[in-house]
């Protein structure tokens, strides 16, 4: 979560795959299987705000389903519901490894569903680097996307904020299986830096 721009989006995608298998997406039946009563949910993810402390995050998320990770031990990874062979998950990054550090990044996989996905390949192709977030959403459909990751590198300043959206076609999203028609869009300071799509028609 500590990179920016189009390269950041590609690296985040790779990290998400690793995280799904290694932390947030522990294989079903493993010793680290989640306690279903307290798993991370979309509501909990939304409730956890930038600027919260590590303890505040754990109080909301449920410490029994979370663990610390990251190169400097400054991230918290929390498991959600079962999603095929893996788990949905959320990751929260902090301004430092200190106990009183503040949340400066959030990411999630399969916790937030698009409200009304209508993305198509034609709409995706109309999206160009340099568009604002508002312009992109007006093109792909306001209900097609959810926030995959958001990072404030100079928190509490909003300068340099990076945002990644996951967007879907009408049948693309699945909370428990593989995504089908979908796209990732990466922004820095509200301006599109790059895009990628899978199986859109």
From Swiss-Prot:
Outcome reported for the amino acid change (mutating residue 109 to M): Increases binding affinity for K.pneumoniae beta-lactamase SHV-1 and E.coli beta-lactamase TEM-1. Decreases binding affinity for K.pneumoniae beta-lactamase SHV-1 and E.coli beta-lactamase TEM-1
GO cellular component, one term: extracellular region
Signal peptide range: 1-36
Primary location: secreted
Biological processes annotated in GO: regulation of beta-lactamase activity
Disulfide bond entries: 66-78, 145-167
Localization, UniProt: Secreted
Pfam families: BLIP
Keywords, alphabetical: Disulfide bond, Repeat, Secreted, Signal
Entry keyword Repeat: yes
Known role: Inhibits a wide variety of beta lactamases.
Subunit (UniProt): Interacts with E.coli beta-lactamase TEM-1; interaction inhibits hydrolysis of beta-lactam antibiotics. Interacts with K.pneumoniae beta-lactamase SHV-1. Interacts with K.pneumoniae beta-lactamases KPC-2 and KPC-3; interaction inhibits hydrolysis of beta-lactam antibiotics. Interacts with E.coli beta-lactamases CTX-M-14 and CTX-M-15; interaction inhibits hydrolysis of beta-lactam antibiotics.
Name of the protein: Beta-lactamase inhibitory protein
Organism (species): Streptomyces clavuligerus
């Amino acid at each position: 979560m500590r990179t920016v721009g189009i390269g950041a989006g590609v690296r985040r995608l790779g990290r998400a795959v690793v995280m799904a298998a290694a932390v947030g997406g522990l294989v079903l039946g493993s010793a680290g299987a989640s306690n279903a009563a307290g798993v991370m949910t979309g509501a909990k993810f939304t409730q956890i705000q930038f600027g919260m402390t590590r303890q505040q995050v754990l109080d909301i998320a449920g410490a029994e389903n979370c663990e610390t990770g990251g190169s400097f031990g400054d991230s918290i990874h929390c498991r959600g519901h079962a999603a095929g062979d893996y788990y949905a998950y959320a990751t929260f990054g902090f301004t430092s490894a200190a106990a009183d550090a503040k949340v400066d990044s959030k990411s999630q996989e399969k916790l937030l569903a698009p409200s009304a996905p209508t993305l198509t390949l034609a709409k995706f192709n109309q999206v160009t680097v340099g568009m604002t977030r508002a312009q992109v959403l007006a093109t792909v459909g306001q209900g097609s996307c959810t926030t995959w990751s958001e990072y404030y590198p100079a928190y509490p300043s909003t300068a340099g904020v990076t945002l990644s959206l996951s967007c879907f076609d009408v049948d693309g999203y699945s909370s428990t299986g593989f995504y089908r028609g979908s796209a990732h869009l990466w922004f820095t300071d509200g301006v599109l830096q790059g895009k990628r799509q899978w199986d859109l028609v």
